[in-house]
A protein has these predicted regions:
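Preference for intrinsically disordered or flexible, low-complexity segments
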Residues: 1-282
């Protein structure tokens, strides 16, 4: 098989470039994000349209109690009828520094009894509630204490390209040139060329091979922890969904999926009520 030329790889990768927002843990909920925190490519933060007290209850957080619209109740699992556990919420309009999906806020709940992994039959064992705007938000308290300790994050903007297995979906031409389904020494040498080209485009710090897009993040491309690309397609338009939230093992959350598992939430950009869930473990 021919050796890949880095210049050609750059030409194939450049049109795939996206941005993503990495969520970094902080001790206390941030009151505001400076332009330096947001990164050199970010626009100034929008001013909240709601009072400060409303904004504080809707801040991005993992654990604690969720924010909900007035009248909403705590969700139940369709499988076991037990309460879903609140995992995270994201103030997408404020903390999403990337090319965001057209929602302003979302919450994520999960059933630890049924432990869904993304099969269609498990759809009622997890829930994403998304909002184009929060009109009458409130903190939805349930029980005496939350499922997980409340933790907070600040956003950081990064560039994002598909990882190695993601090229099978997003750039089949490059996948076939490597070729991606070969474990030969020549293919591994070609993967190193792809890695160098990707690092040059994203300016991401070098990690172990094929570890692009690691971290807890919203937007961009997923880092597939152990397996092929499992991006779900929208059942209405049949287009691949986009990454909404990726949760890797992190001090941001005590939630764990399997053996050092990574959870991925997806959403269709056109049909935002269409969402998907995947989990991969190392």
């Amino acid at each position: 098989m021919p050796a890949l030329q880095e210049e050609h790889v750059v030409q194939l990768l450049r049109p795939l470039m996206r941005t993503r927002t990495v969520l970094e843990p902080v001790q206390n909920p941030p009151e505001a994000h400076t332009r330096e925190r947001r990164g050199p490519h970010a626009a100034p933060p929008p001013q909240p349209a709601q009072p400060a007290a409303t904004w504080e209850c809707a801040t991005t957080r993992f654990g604690g109690f969720p924010t909900a619209e007035e009248g909403e109740t705590w969700p139940l699992c369709d499988g076991c009828a037990d309460d879903l556990a609140f995992v995270a919420q994201v103030d997408h309009s404020r903390d999403g520094l990337h090319d965001r999906l057209p929602i302003s806020f979302f919450t994520f709940f999960y059933c630890w009894n049924c432990h869904p992994w993304g099969r269609d039959s498990e759809r009622g064992a997890w829930l994403v509630r998304s909002y184009t705007a929060l009109r009458r938000p409130k903190v939805l308290v349930h029980g005496t204490e939350p499922d997980f300790e409340e933790r907070h994050a600040v956003p950081r903007l990064e560039k994002s390209l598909p990882d190695a297995v993601g090229l099978h979906l997003h750039c089949r031409e490059l996948w076939d040139l490597v070729p991606g389904d070969s474990g030969s020494p020549e293919a591994w040498a070609n993967w190193h060329v792809v890695d160098r080209a990707a690092l040059g485009l994203t300016q991401e710090r070098a990690r172990a091979p094929h570890m692009r897009n690691a971290a807890v993040a919203i937007g961009g491309y997923p880092y597939w922890a152990n397996g092929g690309d499992e991006t779900p397609v929208c059942t209405e338009c049949t287009l691949p969904m986009e990454l909404l939230l990726q949760i890797r093992p992190s001090e941001l959350t005590d939630a764990m999926w399997g053996d050092v598992g990574t959870l991925y939430l997806f959403m269709c950009r056109i049909h935002t009520q269409q969402t998907g869930l995947r989990i991969q473990c190392t």
